[in-house]
Amino acid sequence: MARMHSRRRGSSGSDRPTADEPPEWSEVDEDAIEDRVVELAEEGYDPSQIGLKLRDEGVQGVPVPDVKLATGKKVTEILEENDAENELPEDLRNLMERAIRLREHMDRNPGDAQNKRALQNTESKIRRLVDYYRGDKLDEEFTYSYEDAKDRLE
């Protein structure tokens, strides 16, 4: 499979080992994991950062290698159940932040053709993601604009 905005192929990475149950060294109560996930979300962490925190720091000193194996639910599902989810999906939010940084860079450096193309590609990805999420996680009327993104993220 090729990359979206280049002519190169993607590099394949290693697969996660298949497992049906969490390892025995990571025996943590499901409720404790869910409470920690909600607590981290309220501190401002994104779902991917929450997974990393639980993997590295754990709950009550015991690492949680995989939240879905331990609880049967993904981090985003836990956040939805507890009404702690973000207004925007994480991938869309990250792309919007990148587009804002690129737009500010272009305002300071109008002759930078390489980053002008990077901005065009990023905004193209944003529009594609907005179409994907519209009606499900975003309003039907949602459209991307730089000003709207800047207002939402600041």
Curated annotation (Swiss-Prot):
InterPro entries per UniProt: Ribosomal_uS15, Ribosomal_uS15_arc_euk, Ribosomal_uS15_N, uS15_NS1_RNA-bd_sf
GO cellular component labels: cytosolic small ribosomal subunit
Region (Disordered): 1-32
UniProt biased composition (Acidic residues): 21-32
Basic residues biased stretches: 1-10
CDD domains: Ribosomal_S15p_S13e
Database matches in Gene3D superfamilies: 4.10.860.130, S15/NS1, RNA-binding
One Gene Ontology biological process: translation
GO molecular function terms listed in the Swiss-Prot or TrEMBL record: small ribosomal subunit rRNA binding; structural constituent of ribosome
Pfam families assigned: Ribosomal_S13_N, Ribosomal_S15
Membrane spanning stretches: none
Key words of the record: Ribonucleoprotein, Ribosomal protein
SMART domains, per the entry: Ribosomal_S13_N (SM01386), Ribosomal_S15 (SM01387)
Subunit text: Part of the 30S ribosomal subunit.
Database matches in NCBIfam families: PRK08561.1
Family label: Belongs to the universal ribosomal protein uS15 family.
Protein's recorded name: Small ribosomal subunit protein uS15
The organism of origin for this protein: Natronomonas pharaonis (strain ATCC 35678 / DSM 2160 / CIP 103997 / JCM 8858 / NBRC 14720 / NCIMB 2260 / Gabara)
